[in-house]
């Protein structure tokens, strides 16, 4: 369960070459289809998939961004330089190289691409190796799509953790106020929401500012997404509540919308292109049959 300390931070930056393999409900919900036929490579070509894998490993081990860009192609700069923190990028590449050295293997996938798996946990490198006229290269376009799928999956998993944290926050608030609240941010010095600026005599609020500003208030105030999701609190009479989490950008930051009850039971639904509009209109946790329990 997410601890309060996690809610008081902005969270980790999105790492495009993250070393965590996520199960992706989001990918199943996508309708973009399978890999398209290989196109003329924009980066380096290799005689064998093994050579391509060895080349990307060597470049990562040296932290050679110019060589990585040469291997992946000029259009892959957003993949090679995925944030402004050079130290973080170097650290992630070193971890990838260590996993590669520990164990690596290549596997031909059903779509005829070749996937590179590294480490004892068999982490799949997101950029596939594809064939074009007898030569092999990394397809950065397909890799960029896979990276997006993984980030969506990561956001959805984090959204569920945030919902659990908000359930705990509501219960903490109730212990002091003897009532639940639908507000994320308190009004001035009145503790009528889950977040307030700490005062000498006011104690620490149940949630921190970053999550608080991801809350969509009933008055329509401006919100900022937290790890790609917005949140709402539904009050169920005077003795109950539910948490709603929906993606800030459908099919980009997330796919599924979630509703979580006070006991931690969660339900999910793909609300489609009108996700934001529909999610803002949800008024009860008593969902219809289109909502499926999250296992």
What is the predicted role of each segment?
Residues 22-26:
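Sec/Tat signal peptide C-region and signal peptidase I cleavage site
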Residues 10-20:
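Bacterial N-terminal signal peptides
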Residues 77-125, 217-240:
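Surface-exposed, charged secondary-structure patches
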Residues 27-62, 142-168, 172:
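Short, low-complexity N-terminal intrinsically disordered segments enriched in polar/charged residues
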Residues 175-249, 253-256, 260, 270:
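Extracellular/periplasmic head regions of type IV pilus-like filament subunits
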Residues 64-76, 183-185:
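Short, well-ordered alpha-helical segments enriched in acidic and aromatic residues
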Residues 1-12:
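Bacterial N-terminal signal peptides that target proteins for export
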Residues 114-157, 164, 265-271, 275:
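Short beta-strand edge/turn micro-motifs at domain boundaries
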């Amino acid at each position: 369960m997410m601890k309060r300390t996690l809610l008081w931070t902005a969270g980790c930056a999105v790492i495009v070459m993250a070393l965590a393999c996520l199960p992706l409900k989001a990918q199943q919900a996508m309708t973009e289809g399978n890999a398209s036929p290989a196109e003329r490579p924009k980066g380096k070509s290799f005689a064998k998939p093994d050579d391509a894998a060895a080349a990307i490993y060597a470049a990562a081990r040296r932290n050679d961004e110019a060589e990585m860009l040469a291997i992946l192609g000029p259009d892959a700069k957003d993949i090679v330089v995925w944030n402004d923190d050079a130290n973080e990028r170097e650290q992630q590449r070193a971890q990838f190289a260590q996993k590669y050295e520990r164990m690596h293997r290549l596997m031909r996938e059903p779509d005829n691409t070749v996937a590179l798996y590294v480490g004892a946990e068999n982490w799949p490198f997101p950029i596939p190796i594809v064939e074009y006229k007898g030569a092999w290269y990394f397809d950065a376009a397909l890799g960029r799509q896979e990276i997006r799928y993984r980030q969506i999956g990561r956001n959805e998993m984090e959204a569920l953790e945030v919902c659990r944290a908000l359930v705990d926050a509501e219960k903490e608030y109730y212990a002091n106020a003897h009532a639940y609240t639908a507000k994320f941010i308190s009004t001035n010095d009145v503790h009528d929401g889950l977040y307030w600026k700490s005062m000498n005599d006011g104690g620490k609020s149940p949630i921190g500012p970053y999550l608080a500003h991801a809350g969509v208030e009933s008055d329509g105030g401006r919100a900022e997404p937290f790890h790609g999701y917005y949140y709402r609190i539904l009050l169920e009479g005077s003795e109950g509540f539910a948490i709603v989490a929906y993606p800030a950008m459908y099919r980009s930051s997330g796919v599924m919308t979630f509703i979580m009850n006070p006991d931690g039971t969660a339900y999910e639904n793909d609300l489609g292109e009108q996700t934001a509009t529909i999610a803002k209109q949800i008024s009860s946790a008593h969902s219809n049959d289109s909502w499926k329990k999250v296992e």
